[in-house]
Amino acid sequence: MEEFQGYLELDRSQQHDFLYPLIFREYIYALAHDHGLNRSILLDNVGYDNKSSFLIIKRLISRMYQQNHLIISPNDSNQKKIGGYNKNLYCQMISEGFAVIVEIPFSLRLVSSLEGTEIVKSYNLRSIHSIFPFLEDKFSHLNYVSDVLIPYPIHLEILVQTLRYWAKDPSYLHLLRLFLHDYYNLNSLITKNKSIFSKSNPRLFLLLYNSYVCEYESILLFLRNQSSHLQFTSSWIFFERIHFYEKIKYPVEEVFANDFPAILWFFKDPFMHYVRYQGKSILASKDTPLLMNKWKYYLVNLWQCHFYVWSQPGRIYINQLSKHSLDFLGYLSSIRPNLSVVRSQMLENSFIMDNARKKFDTLVPIIPLIGSLAKVKFCNALGHPISKSTWADSSDFDIIDRFVRICRNLSHYYSGSSKKKSLYQIKYILRLSCVKTLARKHKSTVRTFLKRLGSKLLEEFFTEEEQILSLIFPRASSTLTRFYRGRIWYLDIFCINDLVNHE
């Protein structure tokens, strides 16, 4: 760790040019695996010491330089062993080592920002918790929304070239390119039927994908901020990237530098909002559908001409918020009119006025959730609870604890829903599935088991927010009911339960 800290304390101008030697430093892999330097960096099933294990990593890197990647052999993907060792294991180790090194330039910018020596240039970074205030405060004032699915798969060469803006070590990037080519052929990282954010994807690939998204957003948000009321004071951040792409013969210099004021006028919209979570983003505007279509075809051309990613206009849907719901962050969000009649009297004359207000609704997607529960055998396709047969061998405490944990996680996340009826249905399915699982284990009926256990089982399913609100408002039942029926956003809901799909 001291050696790693010493490297971080080197002169800032030299750090970007000497990333390649870190690949052959053992402490990098110790950091990647969260082990100390005096412990093994390999799994316990590898019966060799640290030096022997690290030598295998060096040999694997040397083999990458010796292979002829112009000739693709059908047997290359079947070469799982290197001298009797698991190639998948060592490729995963090298992948995590690459990820640690790739993060160094980003970490240095953060350290420089904290020290006040340099301003971080990533203006598009926001916390996920800012999405929920945006939905409540801004969404009801907007008219149209574009549901954008960021295209993938991405060619690995595009990911490496995008990284060149941050890591400027040619030797390191060349080795990374060879490794991705070899590892891609071995494990087929990018497939059409697998989500980029699935747990099977390594940390390195997610980091490369996020750098690609960051680069795409830096261009998109620059145009958006220039056309809004909150403009940047200068354009040097954007033109710094133009100078970078000009060196590698990218067409962005021709696209943006020739007629830059006209392009800004083309995207002029002071009410454009951009929000992204994982691989899905939304563009919302108060303006006409014409401008939304302009942004739509701009995004398609940006992906196809600049990032060489095939995309179709059909991947971007433009909907009117008053007529369609938006599926985002696991919620179904919509805007519905809330009509109220106000009677006003002035002297002897009275007037009846219709007051129409827009109300923002967040609903629990009951059908996808029931489909997710049916997929993991908590219920059938119609939503009727069934026993979880694979858990019947566990203890009663473990069975109840598993069901309660899933129920509380879902209830905790969907506490931001404006209507709780669908959430109550999901909780009912989980409760009855738990009872049926316990009854199956004890070879009893559900009715008999409930009579014997009483209400103690159902008390376990009380959600955490119900308990917290009952402590805050112990004597005001009406206040408790009003707060519980309303939306409650929690700051620890950045991770949705596994039952909710983002694919």
Swiss-Prot record:
InterPro entries for the chain: Domain_X, Maturase_MatK, Maturase_MatK_N
Cross-referenced Pfam families: Intron_maturas2 (PF01348), MatK_N (PF01824)
One annotated GO biological process: mRNA processing
Cell compartment(s), UniProt: Plastid, Chloroplast
One annotated Gene Ontology cellular component of this protein: chloroplast
Protein name: Maturase K
Signal peptide positions (record): none
Domain of life from the UniProt record: Eukaryota
Family recorded in the similarity comment: Belongs to the intron maturase 2 family. MatK subfamily.
Main location: plastid
One annotated GO molecular function: RNA binding
Function per UniProt: Usually encoded in the trnK tRNA gene intron. Probably assists in splicing its own and other chloroplast group II introns.
Keywords: Chloroplast, mRNA processing, Plastid, RNA-binding, tRNA processing
Source organism of this protein record: Cercocarpus betuloides (Mountain mahogany)
